[in-house]
Amino acid sequence: QEHSSAASDVYKRQLQMRCSEVFGIDIHPGARIGKGIMIDHAHSIVIGETAVVGDNVSMLHSVTLGGTGKDDEIRHPNIGDGVLLGAGAKVLGNISVGSCSRVAAGSVVLQNVPEKTTVAGVPAKVVGAAGCTNPSISMDQIIKRK
């Protein structure tokens, strides 16, 4: 059993290195990724070691799920189910993005995001409702004011 776990760890590291080399993507082998993730224009994606990505999440190019250097154990964000992460979005630190929310392109998220909301800006602030039941599937990026 230990041998298969060690072999699995080696395989994960090799896969990480190959993806980084070919696509410019760095997904740490320790990150937990849900089913149905969609990475559109798979380039310049960074997902840190303690990040958790829920089911049916869509992320566009240049998304970072990274740390801030301030946390010891859980350093990366928890992304809920059905979230849409716009191009260039940076979600940093031990924070949560609630299910069925949207993070606008170019936003820097440093605080928790409630479910079914849209955040935008640097730093990101709530700018409206998510506007649909499943942003990651509809890929709707129009801001709907509350």
Where in this protein do the model-derived segments appear?
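Intrinsic disorder/low-complexity segments
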Residues: 1, 83, 133-135
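Left-handed beta-helix
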Residues: 23, 29, 34-35, 40-49, ...
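Single conserved hydrophobic/aromatic residue that forms the stacking wall/gate
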Residues: 1-7, 11
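Acidic/histidine-enriched, glycine/proline-rich intrinsically disordered or flexible terminal extensions
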Residues: 135-146
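Conserved beta-strand-loop-alpha-helix hinge in the C-terminal portion
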Residues: 115-137
